[in-house]
Amino acid sequence: WDLNAIYSDNELRDVTFGQFDLNRLRQGLGPSFIDASGTPRCGTAAAVLAGCVPVDLFGGPDAFTREMADFTGVTLKDETNKELYDYTANITGDLFELPAGPLGFAAGYEYRREQGYFLPDAITASGATTGSAAQPTNGGFSLDEFYAEFNVPVLKDLAFAQVLEISLAARYSDYSNFG
């Protein structure tokens, strides 16, 4: 016989670089003008977008500056968690002796519960990045499972049958989310 217990808690914090904030990219690529001091500004002379950095995608290989990248770039932070509880009990052995050998038996039970969640960065959830949008999600399920197996020896060491056995097995599974 054996008894087992497993607990697992996996947490992932994913940091993604190299994506752009679409709202800031729109601002940086939107209307712009050169102010009186010769500095490019976002918006119009009548409505300057404070803090915005105009983005130049067509000015040659060095036109996209570090300042532009810092303004439009975003670091995304997602969180994922999965938790598992698993308990099993099993018993095996021979029940009694038959003429062709012992009647083998095995039975067991398992209870398992899994749950988890995913929390994307707020910008990812809003769909305002150049990457794929994703929504927060969570869920879980539990399972109760029973099994029984029998190995029935029928014939042994005969001229026409070295070994003849019948194996019988049954399993019952009850999932909390279906079936």
Residue ranges and their predicted role:
Residues 140-157:
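Structured alpha-helical segments in the cores of large, soluble enzyme domains
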Residues 96-104, 155-164:
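Short loop/turn motifs that connect adjacent beta-strands in outer-membrane beta-barrel proteins
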